[in-house]
Amino acid sequence: MTEKAPTSTELDVATNVLKLMADKTRLSILSLLRDGEMTVTAIASALNRPVPAISQHLAKLRMANMVQTRKEGTSSFYSQPDEHLTNLVVNALHFAE
């Protein structure tokens, strides 16, 4: 079976995903979300960072479809959209070991 080269669009998306993951805070957020959904307050508390800073990082991840949101009352819950992103985060962290 012959593999074809990725399209320019696929390369653009992959490059953007890797750029967003290259930030320690965003990678930490994605790592936390491997275990399930969390609120911005819970993420900020776990990372010992201010809520507004975490909100800005989540907005960037959301724009790239790297996190998804679910509203419940006045709370927003963040999670990873699929197992491919989870695997990418796990593999990146294993590579660092």
What are these regions (language model features)?
Residues 32, 39, 69-70, 92:
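Residues in and immediately flanking transmembrane alpha helices
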Residues 62-72, 79:
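Beta-hairpin "wing" of winged helix-turn-helix
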Residues 12-52, 76-84:
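N-terminal helix-turn-helix DNA-binding core of bacterial DNA-binding proteins
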Residues 57:
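Residues within the DNA-recognition helix of helix-turn-helix
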Residues 2, 18, 77-97:
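Conserved segment of winged-helix/HTH DNA-binding domains
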Residues 1-9:
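Short, intrinsically disordered or compositionally biased N-terminal tails of bacterial proteins
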